[in-house]
Amino acid sequence: MKIGFLTILLFLVVQTAWGQFRVHSGMTVTVNCDKSEAPVVHTALELLQRDYRAVFSDSLHCEETRGNILVGTLEVNNAVEQSKADLSGLKGMREAFLLTVLPDGRLLIAGSDSHGTAYGIMELSRLIGVSPWKWWADATPMKRKSFELPSGYRNVQAPSVEYRGIFINDEDWGLMPWSSLHYEPWYKPGRIGPKTNERIFELLLRLRANTYWPAMHECTQPFFLTKGNREVAKKFGIYIGGSHCE
């Protein structure tokens, strides 16, 4: 009787452990992501790799073959549909994402579009303990030896506001001199360049924002006239607004 009970208990424990998603220090972890994904998805993956290294002191590898983590956008990566996961929460949604543990223990990060996929990747960074304010607030993440999500874990989220972001105001006394005199001193005064904007856009991406209204005071050179700004906005999937001075 006792042997039978222990056998059943052991079977249940093994089944539970098998269905978990688990990573730990020293483990080879691979992300399966198609090269045809949009730039914002690959940008988010680069941030995740950096975050993973900061938390586990290990590398996260990105490949197009089978991995511990499957990343993909609906109608871009066929592996998402082939995973047999319930994708109903993404259909017809804008910038939505799904994180779910598959029966074989892999983690699926899927998006209804490229922004949704990128936000799902950043959600994993948040779950392992990385703050969106990591750089701006010197919020260094705590080291961990392992991280796991239970069997059947499912996390579906979508924004309720279509365009979400910030505008830069009164840059004369803060952002502009800091950027052009200290953070990017190779630019002439009056320019807020791509290095500064990359830090701003990283924060926006981590916070799931998608829109930015640049500084427009007379002391500042226009956003699109500063070389590199357009490219960094595309890299982070940021829409640039022009209604600031209304």
Report the location of each language-model feature.
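Bacterial Sec-dependent N-terminal signal peptides
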Residues: 1-22
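Short secondary-structure capping/junction motifs at helix and strand boundaries
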Residues: 2-4, 131-136, 210-212
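Contiguous, structured surface segment used for ligand recognition
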Residues: 20-158
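Aromatic-lined carbohydrate-binding surfaces of glycoside hydrolases
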Residues: 34-37, 65, 75-79, 160-246
